[in-house]
Design a protein with these regions (language model features):
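Short inter-helical turns and helix N-cap capping residues of alpha-solenoid HEAT/ARM repeat scaffolds
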Residues: 48-49, 79-82, 112-115
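Residue-level signature of alpha-solenoid helical repeat scaffolds
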Residues: 58, 74, 91, 106, ...
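Residue-level signature of the C-terminal ends
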Residues: 28, 60-63, 93-99, 126-130
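Amphipathic alpha-helical scaffolding segments comprising HEAT/armadillo-like alpha-solenoid repeats
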Residues: 3-7, 23, 32-44, 65-78, ...
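Residue-level detector of extended alpha-helical repeat arrays and alpha-solenoid scaffolds
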Residues: 53, 69, 82-86, 117
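Cys/His-rich microdomains that often coordinate metals
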Residues: 15, 29
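Flanking scaffold residues of small Cys/His-coordinated metal-binding clusters
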Residues: 2-3, 17
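Cys/His-coordinated zinc-binding microdomains
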Residues: 12, 26
Length: 141
C-alpha cells in the first residue's frame, strides 16, 4: 500500500501527508495553510504547473485587488512562452485600476511575446478611452 502524500506549498516537493513541517525545505505547513487567501493566490503565481498559475491569475483578476498587479505582471514575464497565460494576465490587470494600468504598460514594453505586448498595449489604450483603439478587435480573453 502506497503512503499518502501531499505537495509542500513552499517548495512543491512530494512529502508525507501527515507532515506538519516539510522535510525538504523546513516550511511550517500549518502556518502556510492558515495564510490569507490572497497570499495563497500570490504564492500560486510561482507554482511550476501552468494550470495552477492560471487559476490564480483568474481568481486575482476577479478579486480586483490593485496591490496584486505587479505580481501578476511578474508572473507573465517569468513565463514568456506561455502566451495564453500572458493574455489572461492582461485581462486580469484590466480590472485593477491604475496599478493594473501601470503593469499593463510594463508588459506592453517588456513582454517577449508580441501577442502579449500587443494585447497589453491595446488594453492600455482602451482603458484610457482612446477612440482609435482598434474597435473591430476583441479585447484579450
Amino acid at each position: 500500500v502506497a503512503e499518502a502524500r501531499q505537495i509542500c506549498p513552499a517548495c512543491y516537493r512530494l512529502i508525507p501527508a501527515d507532515a506538519h513541517v516539510c522535510p525538504a525545505c523546513g516550511a511550517d505547513l500549518d502556518a502556510l495553510s492558515a495564510r490569507d487567501y490572497r497570499v495563497k493566490l500570490l504564492a500560486a503565481l510561482h507554482h511550476p504547473l501552468d494550470d495552477v498559475r492560471m487559476r490564480a491569475i483568474l481568481a486575482l483578476g476577479l478579486r480586483g485587488e490593485p496591490e496584486t498587479a505587479e505580481a501578476l505582471a511578474d508572473c507573465a514575464l517569468r513565463h514568456p512562452v506561455d502566451v495564453v497565460e500572458g493574455l489572461a494576465v492582461v485581462d486580469a490587470l484590466s480590472h485593477l485600476g491604475r496599478a493594473g494600468a501601470r503593469a499593463l504598460a510594463r508588459l506592453a514594453e517588456n513582454h517577449p511575446a508580441r501577442g502579449v505586448r500587443d494585447a497589453a498595449q491595446l488594453m492600455t489604450l482602451r482603458l484610457r478611452g482612446d477612440a482609435n483603439a482598434a474597435p473591430d478587435q476583441a479585447p484579450p480573453a
